[in-house]
From Swiss-Prot:
Catalytic activity of the protein: D-glyceraldehyde 3-phosphate + phosphate + NAD(+) = (2R)-3-phospho-glyceroyl phosphate + NADH + H(+); S-nitroso-L-cysteinyl-[GAPDH] + L-cysteinyl-[protein] = L-cysteinyl-[GAPDH] + S-nitroso-L-cysteinyl-[protein]
Residues bearing the modification ADP-ribosylcysteine: C150
Residues engaged in binding NAD(+): R11, I12, D33, R78, S120, N314
Cysteine persulfide: modified positions: C150
Keyword field contains Transferase: yes
S-(2-succinyl)cysteine: residues bearing it: C150, C245
Name of encoding gene: GAPDH
Organism per entry: Canis lupus familiaris (Dog)
In-chain residues carrying the UniProt-annotated modification Deamidated asparagine: N7, N62, N68, N147, N153, N223, N314
Chain positions with Phosphoserine modification: S120, S146, S149, S239, S310, S331
Cross-link (Glycyl lysine isopeptide (Lys-Gly) (interchain with G-Cter in SUMO2)): K184
Active site: residue positions: C150 (nucleophile)
Descriptive protein name: Glyceraldehyde-3-phosphate dehydrogenase
Origin organism lineage: Eukaryota, Metazoa, Chordata, Craniata, Vertebrata
Family designation: Belongs to the glyceraldehyde-3-phosphate dehydrogenase family.
Role, per record: Has both glyceraldehyde-3-phosphate dehydrogenase and nitrosylase activities, thereby playing a role in glycolysis and nuclear functions, respectively. Glyceraldehyde-3-phosphate dehydrogenase is a key enzyme in glycolysis that catalyzes the first step of the pathway by converting D-glyceraldehyde 3-phosphate (G3P) into 3-phospho-D-glyceroyl phosphate. Modulates the organization and assembly of the cytoskeleton. Facilitates the CHP1-dependent microtubule and membrane associations through its ability to stimulate the binding of CHP1 to microtubules.
Amino acid sequence: MVKVGVNGFGRIGRLVTRAAFNSGKVDIVAINDPFIDLNYMVYMFQYDSTHGKFHGTVKAENGKLVINGKSISIFQERDPANIKWGDAGAEYVVESTGVFTTMEKAGAHLKGGAKRVIISAPSADAPMFVMGVNHEKYDNSLKIVSNASCTTNCLAPLAKVIHDHFGIVEGLMTTVHAITATQKTVDGPSGKMWRDGRGAAQNIIPASTGAAKAVGKVIPELNGKLTGMAFRVPTPNVSVVDLTCRLEKAAKYDDIKKVVKQASEGPLKGILGYTEDQVVSCDFNSDTHSSTFDAGAGIALNDHFVKLISWYDNEFGYSNRVVDLMVYMASKE
C-alpha cells in the first residue's frame, strides 16, 4: 500500500485523509500544515459541518496525530522543500494547499524525499489526469501530476461518453457551484476579480472557471470545442454541471440516457453515476462519484442539440479521486 503525505490540512487535505481511511486503499503517514497545530488538527478532522463527525477515533499522542490507532507524523513547515517526507516514509505527497500548483513549486516536495506529487488542483504546466477519462495515459516517468479540478472531474467523464457515442461538435458548460474557501463571508476586497469578493451567502456570483477548457487537455479531440463559466451560489457543498452541446450524430434523449447508464454500470462504475430519481443537491452530500447524470433534468431541443445535467460533491467526490489516482499510479511502479 502506497505511503502518503498530505500538505495542507484544509477542506481537500482533510477529506483526502478521510477518503483514505474510509477506503483503506492508501496509507497516510504524514501531514504538514504550518497554520494548524496538532490539537487543532484533531478537532478539525473529527468535526465537519458538511460531512458530519468522523466515524472513528482521533487523538494527539506523543506529538503525532492518531487516527483509528494509526500514528501520523506532523510537520509545520511553510517551505515545502523543508518537509522531511522521506523521514516519515511518505512516498507520494498530496499537494492540497492550493498554493504550490506549478511543476516548479510542487517539485519542492521531491527535495524532502517524496517520490511523486499529486496536485489537488488544476495546474498551469503539470500533466492533468481525470480518473476514467485519461488516467491510463499516466506513465511512471512523471514525478508531478495534477488531479485537475472537481468540475473537470464532473464534466470530463460525461463529455467522454457523449463524444465517444455521438460526437460533440461544440459545447458550453455552466457549473452552478457551491461556496468554497476562496470566497468572502461578507463583501471584501478580491484583487482583480471584483465580483468574487462579494458576500458568498447573499449572492449568486458569476465567476470564471477553466474546467471546460481543461477537458480539452484530458480529451484532446475536444480541445477548443468546450468552454464555460460558473455561478457561485449560497450552498455549502454539492455543485451541478450543465453541459449544452451540439452533437455530430443525431440522438434521441433516450439514446443518450441509455449510453450514460451503460457507462455508469460498466467502464465508469464508481466514477460516473446515473439517476432517474427526483433529486436535489443535498442528496449528493458525501457522494463518492465524480459525476452523477440526472436523467430527468436534461432536455433536448432536437436530435442534435441537448442540455445535459450532472451532479457532484465538489469536496468528497474529488477527494476520493485523488486517492484513486494514487492507487493507480502505485500500480505502475
